[in-house]
Amino acid sequence: MKNSLIMVLLFVLQKGNSQELFVVTDPASNVPANSLGVNIMQSTFKEKFESGYNYHFMPEVTYGINKNIMARGTAFISNRSNQLVTEGGSFLVKYRFFSADDLNSHFRMAAYGRYSFNNSDIHQEQIEILGHNSGFETGIIATKLINKLAISSSISFEKAMDNKPNYPFPDAIGDNATNYTLSFGKLMYPKKYTSFKQTNINLMIEFVGQTINENGKSFLDVVPAVQFIFNSQARLDLAYRKQLLSSMFRTAPNGFYLNLYYTFFNLKK
């Protein structure tokens, strides 16, 4: 009986949330309570001003403390020094403070905070505490699911600090920014659910932007993606990030993401 209830839960989760598991942004929904998500995030970006590629390997674990609160830890590993080096990590907590459910739709809102530490060199004006800068970020996310379409948007404040011990933040560039995102996800397959074991195929497009508060310099990127979900537990993401416009100095704005994600449900029995 207990196993049957778990099966039903997985089916409901797949049917309701699969198309709002975005690649480069977080939705307002959380990892299910008492569940652990393991994500192997990889990105390869073309260097703009020199030959070669910037590779980042960022494993992360996410735990659902309860239905409204989740916590996440991420490690930062890159080839910035021409070899794979561990550069730091981050901790995130997200709190879902609003939820409204209907038969074929739901609306969620959440607030989050992230703190990161990083020892790599500071080499661009863009502030990115997920893999490049030490600092913190806090923001709000709103996500709407209507049938097979998910729409999510966020706004956040991000503050960069010194990359200790060797790289103080440069005085000549702004150290805080406003971030904004808009994401769309559409379930393309299956057309009709018959089992939680069905493979899901989602198409997504995400817009990611930032404005440095001190000087107004900005960028806007687009991220088209395809996503496969297997057996309601395993996920494969493939995405390409392309700079649409920018007035700030960025060393590697264009590149690919490959994410491998697995969720362990019902850890405490």
What are these regions (language model features)?
Residues 166-168:
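Extended low-complexity, intrinsically disordered segments associated with secretion/export
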Residues 1-22:
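Bacterial Sec-dependent N-terminal signal peptides
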Residues 18-162, 171-269:
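Transmembrane beta-barrel domains of Gram-negative outer membranes and organellar outer membranes
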